[in-house]
Amino acid sequence: MWNLIRQTFKNMYSSRNDESMNGMIICADYELTIHHGIKTKKQMIKAKKQCDDMTWEMEYLNLMSGGAEGQYYTYDLINHSQVLKKAFYPLTLEEYYNSKQPNYNKTERFGYIPKEEDEVRILSMDIAVAKSTSKKKNDFTDIKAIRATRKDDIYIRQEVYSEGHEGVPVIEQALYLKRLYFDFEADWIVLDGRTYGIDLIDQLARPTYDAERETTYPAMKVFNEDTPSAKDLGDRCKDPNAIACIYAFIASNERNHIMHTNMKDALLSGKFKCLKSNLVAKDEYLRGRKEYIFADGREKARLEAPYIYSDMTLNEMISLSRDETKAMITLKEPNTGTKDKYIARAMGNYFITNFLETKLTKKENYNMDDWYKVSLVGGYKQTFRI
């Protein structure tokens, strides 16, 4: 529906000499519905609480989704990547305990996505700790779950889940990340190896007890040595049984430039795909599922959340503008905005491009077993450098 409105809007200004392209839009925001008693003020307040900012502006204020002046990513570019219907969902507490039953079939769980033979799964995380205030809007911690499926000498990326946290202590963020790592059957974790990222890496480097699930997750460590800082982060972990699964992204002007260009290339080439917008997903997918139809309000909000995050990431990306005064690409968010969702997405894509895909394009045949030795320790996949 939104694409139809946008096209009609364009036709209003481009159809003067072509009557077949005539178009007209009449828009009325929520105030008119209140004035005529179609909706009450209380109903509008409730509707706003249930919407993300982007949906509220589009559906109730009739504001078109626009971008920043000098934007690096256009609406159409990112909107064309929103093609995935099915989202991944982490296990609820009830689902987790059900999964321990002898006759449990995980393929029947809503939100389960089977892992393909050549598939690699990545969790990419941009970390923040401070809470936003009325005077300053801080970034959220954002985690993206990305599937990378091999096709010839490239990987097709599918971002199937996102979640965000604000003002959460690092020790709790380590728990959330490890829990999601095993729920998603992930292979790698990508995160910023500076500032708060260092504290998080230190927390991940020790076993983590999950009181809700009554289980302990193993230690995890940084494996990459492409910068001295990354190597130092790997050396901080003293647990000999730690899983070597963390890629520490050490930002620099050059590395950020590569990250931005990699992200744009993945979108332009169609390699990067993400979830449909929330409005489309509800119409085309969720409203046809019994899990959504018979869910209460809280559960419906949980099921819609990944699609809302897809919209929020789009809105964030089209609000980024390029600093034209610098030779290397630098992206700036507006004064009232953030870019945590974009950074989480772009770091994950950077890892796939510069770590996974480069192995495929080498002349020699790349074999993961040549780089890592895998065994089972305590029921978990154990990976370490040799």
Residue ranges and their predicted role:
Residues 7-18, 210-242:
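Short mixed-charge
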Residues 38-224, 257, 261, 274-386:
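RNase H-like, metal-dependent nuclease domains and their acidic two-metal-ion catalytic environment used
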Residues 233-237, 252, 271-278, 306:
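GHKL/Bergerat-fold ATPase module in large chromosome/replication-associated machines
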Residues 1-83, 241-260, 265-269:
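Conserved P-loop NTPase catalytic core
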